[in-house]
Structures are given as C-alpha cells and as structure tokens.
Design a protein with these regions (language model features):
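Catalytic-site microenvironment of enzymes
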Residues: 1-252
C-alpha cells in the first residue's frame, strides 16, 4: 500500500544529509552491445545514473496489505525486488536494496540508503490493498512544501522537493512501459502523499501492482517478470535525462 500518514514531528527533525553536486554528463561508451541474456538491448552504461535503489516496502512486524489465502504484501514485494534486481543487473546497473529479508528498516533508514548513493534513482515496491487486479500504477510524491528556507537550506523531510520534476519524468516513463504490459493501467504517473519518497534526495517513484484481493498469489507472481522488465526499461530510458539538481544545502 503506497499512501502513508504524515510523519510525526520527531520524524521530520532528522540530521541533515548532503545533496550531491550536479553530475557531469559524459558521452555514451562506443563499446556497447546487446547482452546475450538481456530481455532488451542495452548499451554500455556511461557515468551518471548507474545505481538503482530498490525498496521492498514493509517487512518484519509490518506485513503491509493482507489478502485472502495468506497473501502478505511484504513477502510479495521482496520476491518482486529480486526479479527486478536480476533484470536491472543484466543491463549493467548496480542495484542496492533497502532490505534483503524479513526486516523492517525505518522510513529514514530506507531514505538514507538512497541518499548515500551517487547517481541513483529510488523505486519503492508495493501491492495495492484496493487497486484493480492485473494493473500497475506509478506514484510520485505530491506532498512538497517549499524547497528551502530563507538561507537556502532544505530540511530532511523536504529532501524530495528539488527532485520532483525528475521524479515525474522517471515515473511517466516507467508507467508507460507498465501500461504496455498491463491493460487498464494509467497512462502517466499519479501523485500521492508517499511518506517514503518525501525524505529521498534522488529521482524517486513508488510502483504499486495489482491488489491483495486477488484469489491466488500466483496471479501476482505472474506479473513479476513484466513489472521487472517495465521498470528496467524505464530506468534505461530515463538515464539520458538524469542529472542531479544543483540543490541548496540541507538544514541540520
């Protein structure tokens, strides 16, 4: 489930993170080629966007959305992350996960994992509690307070604000590929108040698939290869547009 409640004051008054300086564009390598096991052709990756941070939502004592037949969101998105990771790695991307097993890192720990990377995008994975089965939706954060105070500093809980435009571009690309795979999915990314995205200083999206209301978990598992392919295609398509904004500093 994507939409989450607003953070408490204690969650917003966090230590500062450093927003990396703008990336220096470089020309694509001429020694590219199609990977033999790749689901689609990929050129050798130049400097810039090379890291994808995958966030399987929930975990530990938080199962996320639950459906009939023992369906638990936290378990399904962890398996989905493995599929997405394999597909991305075939394209030459480095992949970092916020969790590897049944643990539940805090929102801030998950964001810190992404914020520590350079040249990264962030994708948090969810299963809907009420969505249309068989579809997939991308969300970008809509809860964007002013970017900086009068001194040009950004509080931790507003870290996503300078990246909103890039997140929207990235989200629309991924949503377009998901729509090609899953009939009835939206044409473009939607906006929502997504707590996990708010403190992430990188292009960041939430991908929510199908619904836990399906009769059989196998219905969700069958979507995994298509979701993984769509995300990987979206990342590859976004790569030429990737640049780190020349954002202000961050409020301690």
């Amino acid at each position: 489930m994507v939409v989450s409640p607003s953070p408490s004051p204690s969650q917003t008054q966090q230590p500062a993170f450093g927003i990396p300086p703008p990336a220096t564009p470089s020309a694509p390598s001429s020694q590219g080629g199609v990977a033999a096991a790749s689901p689609f052709g990929a050129q050798a990756l130049p400097a810039g966007l090379n890291v994808v941070v995958l966030d399987p939502a929930h975990g530990g004592t938080d199962p996320g959305a639950r459906g009939t037949g023992g369906i638990r969101e936290s378990e399904i998105v962890l398996d989905l992350a493995i599929q997405v990771r394999r597909t991305l790695e075939l394209q030459g991307f480095q992949v970092v996960q916020t969790r590897q097993g049944n643990e539940n890192p805090s929102f801030d720990d998950r964001s810190a994992t992404a914020n520590a990377q350079r040249g990264a995008v962030f994708v948090t994975l969810h299963i809907s509690s009420t969505g249309l089965p068989g579809t997939a939706r991308v969300y970008v954060n809509s809860d964007l307070p002013p970017i900086a105070d009068s001194k040009g500093l950004i509080p931790w809980d507003r870290a996503q604000a300078p990246f909103f435009g890039l997140s929207r571009t990235f989200g629309d690309l991924v949503q377009g590929f998901l729509r090609q795979r899953f009939k009835g999915s939206p044409d473009t990314a939607q906006t929502a108040s997504v707590r996990q995205l708010r403190t992430t200083a990188a292009p960041a999206i939430a991908v929510e698939i199908s619904s836990v209301t399906v009769d059989d978990r196998a219905d969700l598992d069958r979507m995994a290869p298509g979701v993984a392919d769509a995300i990987a295609r979206g990342v590859a398509a976004f790569k030429p547009s990737y640049v780190v904004p020349n954002a202000p500093g961050v409020l301690p």
